[in-house]
């Protein structure tokens, strides 16, 4: 039997839930915030160097959750090494560290992978800490569609290159 590539592509579009996606399922991962982080206290919380290390959950927690969520998402590729258990609203922007609604298995092998999201996380984090972007605006950008936000915040991405800027007021190299 001859296979039709168009039919295969259509099947992929229709069955969507079987393969890893660049954006999380909004019903499973809508995002959740850390109520202890507000616009009024960013200079004492997220903008303090190393702050994310103080709230990051232990690896045993995120590794266990990643395996569970890979099954819940119905990904065809079930190898945990091919995913980063990532916070939709980054810790560096006051995302909730342990709420499963803020974590999802983000594919590593994609044009819009965890590395690209990290670039946006850093740029918006720096924008918030330098007063160029409001905290709620930055959080919404991730919760709504981080890929569209990546395209929209080009100027910040140029100004605050991940890994090439001295982080100054806060954060840490893992910034997420």
Roles of regions detected by a PLM:
Residues 2-5, 10-83, 92-176:
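Nuclease and nuclease-like effector domains acting on nucleic acids or nucleotide cofactors
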